[in-house]
Amino acid sequence: MSIMRVSALAALSAVSSLSVAETPAAAQDKYAQRKAFVSQFAGETKSSMPFFRSYDFEPLGDDALLLWQSPGRAYLLDIEDFCPDLPSAQAIAINNKGSTVNARFDTITVLTRGQSAIDRCRILEIRPVDVKAMKAAEKAGRELDKNANTGG
């Protein structure tokens, strides 16, 4: 079993994207928007992906996960039904054999503060993400927001 631990800073940033006063419906909407954005840059479904270690992860609600293998390589994972603790995950464990993660066979285990890891959530779909294009679109969006806010 390969385990990816998230640094305190990375875990904080994943959780801090949701404000304390945010309603569950607003949080789900935010995850849905982010998942839709990431999906635009996700390629064709793959039956498996190489896996040696992870760099980071980003929950996209309780049914999807953006798994970063490096700053320039990521995969969009769709998860079976739903994985209720995924949005508040401090870390995840990828339960696989060898150096490959297989859709429909392998699972993730969500690790949260104060809870033992009991839920295994099956990986249904694996899609590679065009990280370069996604980051360019994010940068362009920030520039548009900046120009709109400054009147430029």
Feature map (PLM): residue ranges:
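N-terminal secretory signal peptides
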Residues: 23-87, 143-152
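Bacterial N-terminal signal peptides
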Residues: 7-17
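Ligand/cofactor-recognition surfaces for anionic moieties
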Residues: 20
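Generic detector of short, well-ordered, non-transmembrane alpha-helical segments enriched
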Residues: 15-17, 50, 122
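Helix-rich interaction surfaces within compact, conserved domain-sized segments
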Residues: 83-152
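Positively charged n-region of N-terminal signal peptides that target proteins for export
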Residues: 1-5
